[in-house]
Amino acid sequence: MRQAPGFTKTPLLGRLPRQISGGQRQRVAIGRAIVRSPRIFLFDEPLSNLDAQLRDEMRGEIKRLHRDIATTMIYVTHDQIEAMTLADRIVLMRDGLIEQEGAPLELFERPATTFVAGFLGSPKMTFLPGKLSRTAAGASIVLDGDGPRLDLPPGRIADRAAEGMSLILGVRPEHIYRADGMAGAPGEARLQAAIELLQPTGSRTYATFRIGGTPVTAELEAHDAGRPGETITLGINLNRVSLFDAATQRAI
């Protein structure tokens, strides 16, 4: 009890299992495992039956527990927020096979496949299909569906990638921003797009646009998000995008 104060509450001790909720049973089960002081923990979606607020609290408790007792924990989850916030290393699997293994930030910033890129992050990464174009000035990607040509920063794509190769450009909402009246920056692409939908969340607003026929989500400042139907100038930080081979769905 001393070791797991967040997982087993004193008012529950006198009750039978049938007298407590599913979420309370999960918390008691975690507490019972902790006080046994095992050499390794295996958690299989331990927070799945908890409501959102309690799930947030228990994530913090598990994080503190891991820090305090320094015991290896294997934590199975379908929740990418739990994976990112709790893990020292993530093993991301698909259909029983490992897609990528590494530190959370490594998987988030350098995803090995489109599956990894789309699984981590909320709102999820947008995928824009296009073709590689090479000129004496450098490489660019021409987006499908009458989309724009985006000039890639030097060294951003491998030399082995051939002219006309089908690519997928992955861009996260936080790397798209409103650029009206702003000076251009190295590695930045600019384009005009009309706001289709706004989803305010407080300090930030998620705006939906279409680029080359594909819906794209941008994370904008709430006070400067605009209004639906308004056409604004978007900036895309091409230094932070991911590029994938369309045929293999793997990063290049």
Describe the role of every protein-language-model region.
Residues 110-132, 170, 237:
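C-terminal boundary and immediately downstream tail of ABC-type ATPase nucleotide-binding domains
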